[in-house]
Swiss-Prot record:
The lineage of its organism: Eukaryota, Metazoa, Chordata, Craniata, Vertebrata. Pfam families: Hormone_recep (PF00104), zf-C4 (PF00105). Its main location: nucleus. Nuclear hormone receptor that can act as a repressor or activator of transcription. High affinity receptor for thyroid hormones, including triiodothyronine and thyroxine. The keyword DNA-binding applies. It comes from Homo sapiens (Human). This is Thyroid hormone receptor beta. Changing residue 331 to S: No effect on thyroid hormone binding. It is found in: Nucleus. The keyword Oxidoreductase does not apply. One of its GO terms (cellular component) is nucleus.
Length: 461
């Protein structure tokens, strides 16, 4: 048998013999194949003939250009392996197929089912991987064809001759410059993962939906609360310019021993009691400017005010924490250190207020957010002795909903801003409870004349 001059995809093709009907015909084919392999040396031909004669059946002569198609019983291990490889690749090809491919579009290299546009050509996964590995590992110089580069490359023969397969990849237009090295491939994979994660976050955001902002009715409520706070907040935004620092020597010499190892500096305590009455008055005025509060029975108003007064005063002090001087400004006028506030009567409560101030400094709260926090604290329906519990709870829900929508409107860049801010309500409630316990001990240890009447009225049961 001699090579046919017919070409396939630009490469010389070999005629494929038909199935061998009997052994006599098989031996004729052996002779034909020997003639076709005249390129081999005499010893190679003798070795080939000897191997063929050692089997009762004709063993497949493995050419990359031509494969004898024998009966199933005559297929050797190598042909079985090729078939298994083909089946595996065929299964892979049944996966995702891009929408831009026509139905049953074939690989331009081997004719297998194409899976996409790879390195400028429409190819199957097998040829894509072969081309990529060849370029990345610089394997093509080591490829060699035993049959003068005349192999036909199809989905059955593609694994038989690497040189002819690679040449056909180049011939059909696969671009070597598009194959990435390890570093570029890792960078591309990282970029793909980042884009995938970005899309996932965007889809998650869409699934959550657009965060609602305040309605017109809620804006009216927010405006009322904000105006009430601004009108009753001493010094407003000018507190830093108008504050006065408590002298350093005050609050450093404890005189009276308080329970639980705490000590009280009576001079510092005296300074604090002078500003406590106007501070309490401002909290009361804030509450009276809220229509919802004024609609409640007088008894409930008193209970709510007594319950929230220390909490609101602590909040107003905490939002005026100054990291540079490490002080809190009380009632917008007196800047005190942690030690001074502690020795002045508050003891461990001062630590909680300072810690709250340090935490809130990163929240960058505006007047409206502080005002809404105060309204939420004021309308706490769990205060003992309340008559209109459901109404107060409903009022608090209204403030909370408007508050949440306002937070959405503000678009803070702090992660989980809203739940973190709500946790501060819990912290303030704890401060109020600790102060109530501290006050009972202070009444016993400090002279009664040092306590202003309004202070006693608010904090006594």
């Amino acid at each position: 048998m001699t090579p046919n001059s017919m070409t396939e995809n630009g490469l010389t093709a070999w005629d494929k013999p038909k199935h061998c009907p009997d052994r006599e015909h098989d031996w004729k084919l052996v002779g034909m194949s020997e003639a076709c392999l005249h390129r081999k040396s005499h010893s190679e031909r003798r070795s080939t003939l000897k191997n063929e004669q050692s089997s009762p059946h004709l063993i497949q002569t493995t050419w990359t250009s031509s494969i004898f198609h024998l009966d199933h019983d005559d297929v050797n291990d190598q042909s079985v392996s090729s078939a298994q490889t083909f089946q595996t690749e065929e299964k892979k090809c049944k996966g995702y197929i891009p929408s831009y491919l026509d139905k049953d579009e074939l690989c331009v290299v081997c004719g297998d089912k194409a899976t996409g546009y790879h390195y400028r050509c429409i190819t199957c996964e097998g040829c894509k991987g072969f081309f990529r590995r060849t370029i990345q590992k610089n394997l093509h110089p080591s490829y060699s064809c035993k049959y003068e580069g005349k192999c036909v490359i199809d989905k059955v023969t593609r694994n038989q001759c690497q040189e002819c397969r690679f040449k056909k990849c180049i011939y059909v237009g696969m671009a070597t410059d598009l194959v990435l090295d390890d570093s570029k491939r890792l960078a591309k994979r990282k970029l793909i993962e980042e884009n995938r994660e970005k899309r996932r976050r965007e889809e998650l955001q869409k699934s959550i939906g657009h965060k609602p902002e305040p309605t017109d009715e809620e804006w009216e409520l927010i405006k009322t609360v904000t105006e009430a706070h601004v009108a009753t907040n001493a010094q407003g935004s000018h507190w830093k310019q108008k504050r006065k620092f408590l002298p350093e020597d005050i609050g450093q010499a404890p005189i009276v021993n308080a329970p639980e190892g705490g000590k009280v500096d009576l001079e510092a305590f005296s300074h604090f009691t002078k500003i406590i009455t106007p501070a309490i008055t401002r909290v009361v005025d804030f509450a009276k400017k809220l229509p919802m509060f004024c609609e409640l029975p007088c008894e409930d108003q008193i209970i709510l005010l007594k319950g929230c007064c220390m909490e609101i005063m602590s909040l107003r002090a905490a939002v005026r924490y100054d990291p540079e001087s490490e002080t809190l400004t009380l009632n917008g006028e007196m800047a005190v250190t942690r030690g001074q506030l502690k020795n002045g009567g508050l003891g461990v409560v001062s630590d909680a207020i300072f810690d709250l101030g340090m935490s809130l400094s990163s929240f960058n709260l505006d007047d409206t957010e502080v005002a809404l926090l105060q309204a939420v604290l004021l309308m706490s329906s769990d205060r003992p002795g309340l008559a209109c519990v459901e109404r107060i709870e409903k009022y608090q829900d209204s403030f909370l909903l408007a508050f949440e929508h306002y937070i959405n409107y503000r678009k803070h860049h702090v992660t989980h801003f809203w739940p973190k801010l709500l946790m501060k309500v819990t912290d303030l409630r704890m401060i109020g409870a600790c102060h109530a316990s501290r006050f009972l001990h202070m009444k016993v240890e400090c002279p009664t004349e040092l306590f202003p009447p309004l202070f006693l009225e608010v904090f006594e049961d």
